[in-house]
Amino acid sequence: MPYRKYREKKYETKYREAFKVFQEKIGITFTDEKLLIQAFTHSSYVNEHRKKPHEDNERLEFLGDAVLELTVSQYLFQKYPTMSEGELTKLRAAIVCEPSLVRFANELSFGSLVLLGKGEEMTGGRERPALLADVFEAFIGALYLDQGLETVWEFLKEIVYPKINEGAFSHVMDYKSQLQELIQRDGSGNVEYQILQEKGPAHNREFVSRVTLNNVALGLGSGKSKKEAEQQAAAEALKKLKEQL
């Protein structure tokens, strides 16, 4: 056997073993392992191995992007029943953006599994954020094709959803949503808002709102609308609660 073929065979054996260990790590065994390998195959690797029937991960990335948006959307819709469409959209965008996907990928050492061409390898492709984010989406696409939406949901429940529950994306929420998330996380009870006062002429009204937790006042706020007053009350409540932590 020519040395080049021997080297390539050894390389592929090494990667197949790595994928076996990876599946054991995440507790998922692919029915079609070719899909798993494809999810981690960069176009640069395919370009350098044209004589072999390799397929890159770009189509799986396309599919995974849609599956990820759907599953995260469903989770947020169920978790935050009072959150507005605009706030849900902002929160979802923060969860599926490139830096977040890179974080998820790095937690599972996705970079070490990627099949790269020599040029891409030499220029640091294995650690390139855009590449890692694409691989994470491609993996979701492969998992969906191989085992369906339920398994994708279970995987995200281990890797992604806990970050939401820990408040990793709270910075993109409005004050009311942040307060609601904090209270839910601690299991402290129910938050309620009450308009205490409306004052001023019709063209220049001012509202005063109070937010309570289990009938205990947490914050007061005022604004030109009920919504603004509630947001300010929530902001004051958040400040107080964070000082106590």
Curated annotation (Swiss-Prot):
<keyword id="KW-0963">Cytoplasm</keyword>
<comment type="similarity">
    <text>Belongs to the ribonuclease III family.</text>
</comment>
<dbReference type="InterPro" id="IPR036389">
    <property type="entry name" value="RNase_III_sf"/>
</dbReference>
<feature type="binding site">
    <location>
        <position position="134"/>
    </location>
    <ligand>
        <name>Mg(2+)</name>
    </ligand>
</feature>
<dbReference type="Pfam" id="PF00035">
    <property type="entry name" value="dsrm"/>
</dbReference>
<comment type="subunit">
    <text>Homodimer.</text>
</comment>
<keyword id="KW-0699">rRNA-binding</keyword>
<keyword id="KW-0507">mRNA processing</keyword>
<dbReference type="GO" id="GO:0003725">
    <property type="term" value="F:double-stranded RNA binding"/>
</dbReference>
<comment type="function">
    <text>Digests double-stranded RNA. Involved in the processing of primary rRNA transcript to yield the immediate precursors to the large and small rRNAs (23S and 16S). Processes some mRNAs, and tRNAs when they are encoded in the rRNA operon. Processes pre-crRNA and tracrRNA of type II CRISPR loci if present in the organism.</text>
</comment>
<feature type="binding site">
    <location>
        <position position="61"/>
    </location>
    <ligand>
        <name>Mg(2+)</name>
    </ligand>
</feature>
<dbReference type="GO" id="GO:0046872">
    <property type="term" value="F:metal ion binding"/>
</dbReference>
<dbReference type="GO" id="GO:0006396">
    <property type="term" value="P:RNA processing"/>
</dbReference>
<dbReference type="GO" id="GO:0019843">
    <property type="term" value="F:rRNA binding"/>
</dbReference>
<dbReference type="InterPro" id="IPR000999">
    <property type="entry name" value="RNase_III_dom"/>
</dbReference>
<dbReference type="InterPro" id="IPR014720">
    <property type="entry name" value="dsRBD_dom"/>
</dbReference>
<feature type="binding site">
    <location>
        <position position="137"/>
    </location>
    <ligand>
        <name>Mg(2+)</name>
    </ligand>
</feature>
<dbReference type="GO" id="GO:0006397">
    <property type="term" value="P:mRNA processing"/>
</dbReference>
<feature type="domain" description="RNase III">
    <location>
        <begin position="19"/>
        <end position="148"/>
    </location>
</feature>
<dbReference type="GO" id="GO:0010468">
    <property type="term" value="P:regulation of gene expression"/>
</dbReference>
<dbReference type="Pfam" id="PF14622">
    <property type="entry name" value="Ribonucleas_3_3"/>
</dbReference>
<dbReference type="GO" id="GO:0004525">
    <property type="term" value="F:ribonuclease III activity"/>
</dbReference>
<dbReference type="GO" id="GO:0008033">
    <property type="term" value="P:tRNA processing"/>
</dbReference>
<dbReference type="GO" id="GO:0006364">
    <property type="term" value="P:rRNA processing"/>
</dbReference>
<keyword id="KW-0694">RNA-binding</keyword>
<keyword id="KW-0819">tRNA processing</keyword>
<feature type="active site">
    <location>
        <position position="65"/>
    </location>
</feature>
<dbReference type="GO" id="GO:0005829">
    <property type="term" value="C:cytosol"/>
</dbReference>
<feature type="active site">
    <location>
        <position position="137"/>
    </location>
</feature>
<keyword id="KW-0698">rRNA processing</keyword>
<keyword id="KW-0255">Endonuclease</keyword>
<keyword id="KW-0460">Magnesium</keyword>
<dbReference type="InterPro" id="IPR011907">
    <property type="entry name" value="RNase_III"/>
</dbReference>
<keyword id="KW-0540">Nuclease</keyword>
<feature type="domain" description="DRBM">
    <location>
        <begin position="174"/>
        <end position="243"/>
    </location>
</feature>
<keyword id="KW-0378">Hydrolase</keyword>
<keyword id="KW-0479">Metal-binding</keyword>
<protein>
    <recommendedName>
        <fullName>Ribonuclease 3</fullName>
        <ecNumber>3.1.26.3</ecNumber>
    </recommendedName>
</protein>
